[in-house]
């Protein structure tokens, strides 16, 4: 027997074919959401209040300080928030202190700052009753970027950009004449020396002393027309503010506010970290030849000789000195923007590598590690970045790849919320300042100063309408999990679909272990929306990290030490794959190892390996790692497989796959659809609706019983996508459960494992051409036994509002409706629970007053006294739409009088839930896990299906031609292994990239007593004759997708028309018609089908009178009359007349036809037909 038995949860054992032992447990898969939000509550909010505090008025007399904040208890729990359509939020209270410096008076107050949306335990938010997810955003990290450019003459140049988190960009570039220019905030370019002068290096000599002798610098100085700090400041001011009179003071304050004011310019923690990393001298001396001897200024000791080359060892040795005090110098500045008159830099002279003689000395200037707390750019940063640019021109340093994950970072929920909160607070700050100067300083209170509206508005706007706040995909637990782990490059501050090029979307070597190379949507968003890999984490700076096992450099053995590396850090190491053979003691067995280094696959000797992968599945995402035999599938098909699993509809009877990957249990547990125990305990009570667990706590080495936890189960709730959300207990009374153990299955789960589809008997064979083009033939057994039956719940609501003519009323008393239509309504006029409804049936009876005139005072009085039903009402009842038949599951009624929160003008709201049981049907879409999708073309009687030698009819026939060209061979291996496992009564796990090999599959087939090739003779169910060749038959896991024919089928005879053009609307939602477009008209013209053409352009479209006459003629059995003039023709004439053109219509005898005559004809016809043209089913 190959493989070993592994327990997944309490109820499932699988035979696993994995050869590599798991050294690291999978992290909590929704940690990216929960940890980020927790950071926001603990630190993010505090940072914001510290940034804004204190707020002073313009005189400096009043000071408002934010001291502390606290979150209260939410008004409603999660379930009730959903039911009541409110936001699940807690009140945020802030302690504020107001100091009056004149009188010395101090006032403290607690101010309510609005309700703040809370994250549920499962990583979602409930906004206005709907469950939403905040998707993490992939953006370019703030930093200094250097890139190469080739101009139109083929000359190589460079550009540099300093990108902050917010604030002005600073760009450097070279031109054809080897002059270095700078652009401030995308304005016109100026020589870089102008900026240096403005910083306080007025003369040419000072600039040369600062940066060293250089031909590029000489060229730039020649181009520069300024010769002092003042002139340079004026020059920059003219570029930034053209047309304004320049003064030195204005120029100083402008530049100061652009770059050196923390409120206007922010690099953020990550920007400061990246800038220091890029510009610090230690990272730039590697492999360079020193042109001076480095001496420790404190001891006088020689650290490195002139002429020595700094290799990795030397660099490690001199690193402590470089970080401490070697090479530092202080440079004086005068008359510049910055108030300080000196700047501290670190510089070392080296020989330029591009010089043939090797004698050209250049300077490497570092920014001297600016403190982490300084979030704006400093003169040292500007000088060091300019120096790096000059060094690049001499081949020192390197350019950056902006698609490398070291230069792209994630903004998760916490940070996105913080940015939004900052916008609200800064708007509030402005209001506070204004109020301080208007109101009387002695009687003022903090409460009166603070206006919380802008804060609440910005938070509401973010959750309600941001591109990154999305309606959660709740089709099944996997869709839920994937949505929470999604990474989007779109959104505010990100890319746009139209502008994103090929490079950004492409797979990059730094994605390894951080972002899934497979799971991404097909279509315009490909590569812009990605998924986090299974083991990846996000560090404090927002960079994705992936775990590796450390290799001990002394012994060469793989240790148990796990290090999480960012893409930048990984570039310094040689990493071995997870499938390298190891001895018992952790040393590599093979002499030469296949490893990765900076995107190259290389063969190295084993002593050069620094790290080793943790697991083969660390490359892919949660959804992709649920595909068995992924290694045998083409990546394009694997992409479809991963995406289609997210569209699987939860079935009536879920069944976990016989051939799984071992990820089913973890995905199900972390998705948020299952109920997971919060503590270790003993189960005391289990019902369909709740589970009680008594905590077991350890005190002095003994276990004692603690508090009781009550877990409520969701029963047949409507999910966001209209599928049924139902939880079922899987523990019994008396069970001892561990912390984070599954207590109840959610939708699409069985025994604690993800169960998206069913294991069915599949044969690869054709049958009468019915599986042409990937179509699927099913056995009727799957319909009869409810194998692919799913439950769908639709919600309909009707509200009774106040209208100008009086309030609407929900009632059973509806005009012109027979008793038969009301048979299922209760006395209030609302359908009873359990009633069967067909489309068009009344769900909620409602009447709306349609008074033509306002009532006089006397009539109103009579109406009030006698309650006469004299007033005219019309029927506006809620009816079941087309395709909406089913059984009433639940009815919810909300009344303003009962204290329910309803929108303004609404007195009563009724929600009706209708449940449908949908069996599998021709036209439904099905798929396997390998991207093998198809539409059901025929459902055959069981007796006509081909059958096995033992008489078992097969369930599904797939076209064998769907396999070779698509190159998803994984499905064939799954088929064979599934059959063997079913025979052996096993469930198996074949983890991705470490699953069952071909040999394992054949061995398992033999173990099950089957033929080694997995094929069998099949007999035709109609004749009983055997088919000519043996056929591959086995168990495959097939899922039913959310694209069901019931949702797509649509037909219209008459229906609503557009108001202006009077043409039928389009689309199923509007009950529209099929568009007969320009090309279809050409087809009829080509055939010369004149009458058909005329009819389609008039009575079937927008000839208002004509279509009514035609309808009448058809009803009476008369001939169809002549068509009239289409409405769109009249609209066209009116449009041309509105342009001032005189448009006339001529008859065939060239007499003018007046539009008025046509209108009169219409009116006469309408009078005769007794119809009101204006309201002919004209719904917009």
UniProtKB/Swiss-Prot annotation:
InterPro entries, alphabetized: DNA-dir_RNA_pol_bsu_external_1, DNA-dir_RNA_pol_su2, DNA-dir_RNAP_su2_dom, DNA-dir_RNAP_su2_hyb_sf, RNA_pol_bsu_bac, RNA_pol_bsu_CS, RNA_pol_bsu_protrusion, RNA_pol_Rpb2_2
Enzyme class, UniProt record, top EC level: transferase
Xref: PROSITE patterns: RNA_POL_BETA
Quaternary state and interactors: The RNAP catalytic core consists of 2 alpha, 1 beta, 1 beta' and 1 omega subunit. When a sigma factor is associated with the core the holoenzyme is formed, which can initiate transcription.
PANTHER family (alphabetical): DNA-DIRECTED RNA POLYMERASE I SUBUNIT 2 (PTHR20856)
Function, as annotated: DNA-dependent RNA polymerase catalyzes the transcription of DNA into RNA using the four ribonucleoside triphosphates as substrates.
Record's protein name: DNA-directed RNA polymerase subunit beta
Organism: Halalkalibacterium halodurans (strain ATCC BAA-125 / DSM 18197 / FERM 7344 / JCM 9153 / C-125)
């Amino acid at each position: 027997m190959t493989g070993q038995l592994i327990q997944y949860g309490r109820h499932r054992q699988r035979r696993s074919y994995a050869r590599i032992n798991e050294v690291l447990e999978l992290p909590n898969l929704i940690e990216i959401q929960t940890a980020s939000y927790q950071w926001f509550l603990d630190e993010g909010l505090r940072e914001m209040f510290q940034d804004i505090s204190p707020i002073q008025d313009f005189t400096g007399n009043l000071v408002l300080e934010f001291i502390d904040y606290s979150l209260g208890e939410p008004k409603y729990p999660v379930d009730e928030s959903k039911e009541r359509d409110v936001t699940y939020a807690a009140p945020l209270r802030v302690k504020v202190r107001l100091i009056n410096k004149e009188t010395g008076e101090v006032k403290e107050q607690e101010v309510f700052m609005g309700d703040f949306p809370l994250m549920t335990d499962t990583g979602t938010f409930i906004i206005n009753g709907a469950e939403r997810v905040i998707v993490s955003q992939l953006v370019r990290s703030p930093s200094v970027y250097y890139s190469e450019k080739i101009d139109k003459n083929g000359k190589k140049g460079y550009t540099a950009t300093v990108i902050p988190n917010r604030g002005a960009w600073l760009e450097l570039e070279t031109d054809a004449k080897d002059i270095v220019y700078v652009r401030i905030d995308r304005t016109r370019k100026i020589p870089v020396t102008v900026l240096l002068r403005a910083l306080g290096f007025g003369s040419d000599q000072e600039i040369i002393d600062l940066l060293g002798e250089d031909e590029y610098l000489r060229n730039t100085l020649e181009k520069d027309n300024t010769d002092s700090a003042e002139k340079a400041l004026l020059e920059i001011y003219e570029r930034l503010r053209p047309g304004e009179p320049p003064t030195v003071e204005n120029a100083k304050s402008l530049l100061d506010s652009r770059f050196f004011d923390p409120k206007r310019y922010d690099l953020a923690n990550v920007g400061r970290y990246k800038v220091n990393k890029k510009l610090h001298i230690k990272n730039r001396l590697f492999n360079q030849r020193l042109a001076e001897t480095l001496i420790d200024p404190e001891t006088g000791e020689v650290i490195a000789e002139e002429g020595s080359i700094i290799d990795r060892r030397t660099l490690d040795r001199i690193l402590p000195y470089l970080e401490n005090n070697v090479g530092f110098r202080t440079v004086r500045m005068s008359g510049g923007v910055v108030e300080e008159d000196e700047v501290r830099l670190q510089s070392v002279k080296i020989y330029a590598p591009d010089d043939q003689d090797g004698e050209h000395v250049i300077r490497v200037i570092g920014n001297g590690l600016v403190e982490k707390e300084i979030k704006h750019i400093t003169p040292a940063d500007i000088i060091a970045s300019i120096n790096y640019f000059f060094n690049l021109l001499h081949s020192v340093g390197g350019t950056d790849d902006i698609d490398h994950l070291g230069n792209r970072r994630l903004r998760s929920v916490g940070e996105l919320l913080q940015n939004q909160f900052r916008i609200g607070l800064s708007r509030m700050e402005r209001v506070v300042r204004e109020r301080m100067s208007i109101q009387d300083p002695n009687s003022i209170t903090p409460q009166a100063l603070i206006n919380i509206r802008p804060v609440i508005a910005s938070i509401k706007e973010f959750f309600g309408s941001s591109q990154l706040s999305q309606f959660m995909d709740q089709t099944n637990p996997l869709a839920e999990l994937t949505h929470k782990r999604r990474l989007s490059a779109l959104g505010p501050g990100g890319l746009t679909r139209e502008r994103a090029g090929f490079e950004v979307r492409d797979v990059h070597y730094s994605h390894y272990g951080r972002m899934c190379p497979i799971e991404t949507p097909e279509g315009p968003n490909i590569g812009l929306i990605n998924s986090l890999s299974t083991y990846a984490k996000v560090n404090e700076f927002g960079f994705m990290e992936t775990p590796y096992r450390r290799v001990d450099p002394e012994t060469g053995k793989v240790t148990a030490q796990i290090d999480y590396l960012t893409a930048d850090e990984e570039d310094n190491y040689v990493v071995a794959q997870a499938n390298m053979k190891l001895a018992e003691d952790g040393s590599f067995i093979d002499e030469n190892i296949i490893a990765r280094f900076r995107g190259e696959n290389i063969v190295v000797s084993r002593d050069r390996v620094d790290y080793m992968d943790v697991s083969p599945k660390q490359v892919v995402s949660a959804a992709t790692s649920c595909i068995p035999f992924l290694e045998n599938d083409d990546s394009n098909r694997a992409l479809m497989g991963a995406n289609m699993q997210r569209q699987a509809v939860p079935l009536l009877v879920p069944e976990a796959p016989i051939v799984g990957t071992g990820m089913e249990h973890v995905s199900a547990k972390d998705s948020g659809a299952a109920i997971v125990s919060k503590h270790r305990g003993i189960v005391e009570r289990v019902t369909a609706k709740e589970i009680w667990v008594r905590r077991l706590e350890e005190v002095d080495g003994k276990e004692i019983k603690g508090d009781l936890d009550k877990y409520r189960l969701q029963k047949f709730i409507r999910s966001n996508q209209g599928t049924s959300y139902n939880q079922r207990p899987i523990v019994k009374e008396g069970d001892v459960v561990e912390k984070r153990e599954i207590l109840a299955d959610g939708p699409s789960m069985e025994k604690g494992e993800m169960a998206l589809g069913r294991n069915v008997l599949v044969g690869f064979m054709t049958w009468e051409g019915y599986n042409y083009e990937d179509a699927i033939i099913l056995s009727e057994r799957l319909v009869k036994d409810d194998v692919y039956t799913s439950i769908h719940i639709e919600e309909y609501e009707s509200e009774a509002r106040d209208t100008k003519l009086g309030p609407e009323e929900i009632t059973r008393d509806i005009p012109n409706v027979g008793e038969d239509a009301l048979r299922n309504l209760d006395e209030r006029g609302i359908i009873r629970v359990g009633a069967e409804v067909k489309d068009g049936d009344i769900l909620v009876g409602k009447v709306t007053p349609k008074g033509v005139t306002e009532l006089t005072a006397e009539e109103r009085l009579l109406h009030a006294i006698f309650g006469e039903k004299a007033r005219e009402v019309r029927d506006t009842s809620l009816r079941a739409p087309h395709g909406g038949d089913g059984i009433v599951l639940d009815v919810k009624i909300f009344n303003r009088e009962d204290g329910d929160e309803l929108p303004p003008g609404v007195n009563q709201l009724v929600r009706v839930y209708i449940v449908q049981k949908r069996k599998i049907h021709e036209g439904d879409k099905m798929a396997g896990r390998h991207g093998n999708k198809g539409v059901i073309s025929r459902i055959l009687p069981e007796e006509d299906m081909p059958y096995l030698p033992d008489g078992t009819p097969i369930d599904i026939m797939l076209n064998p031609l769907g396999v070779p060209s698509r190159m998803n061979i994984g499905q064939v291996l799954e088929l064979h292994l599934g059959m063997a496992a079913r025979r052996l009564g096993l469930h198996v796990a074949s983890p991705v990239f470490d699953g069952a090999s071909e040999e394992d599959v054949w061995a398992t087939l033999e173990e099950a007593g089957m033929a080694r090739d997995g094929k069998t003779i099949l007999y035709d169910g109609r004749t009983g004759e055997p088919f000519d060749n043996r056929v591959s038959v086995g168990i495959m896991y097939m899922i039913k997708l959310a694209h069901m024919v019931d949702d797509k089928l649509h037909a219209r005879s008459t229906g609503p028309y557009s108001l202006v053009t009077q043409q039928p609307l389009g689309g199923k939602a509007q009950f529209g018609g099929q568009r007969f477009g320009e090309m279809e008209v050409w087809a009829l013209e080509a055939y010369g089908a004149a009458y058909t053409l005329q009819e389609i352009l008039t009575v079937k479209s927008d000839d208002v009178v004509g279509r009514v006459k035609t309808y009448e003629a058809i009803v009476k059995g008369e001939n169809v009359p002549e068509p009239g003039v289409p409405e769109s023709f009249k609209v066209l004439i009116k449009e041309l007349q509105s342009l001032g053109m005189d448009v006339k219509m001529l008859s065939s005898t060239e007499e003018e036809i007046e539009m008025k005559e046509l209108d009169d004809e219409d009116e006469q016809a309408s009078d005769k037909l007794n119809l009101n043209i204006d309201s002919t089913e004209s719904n917009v």
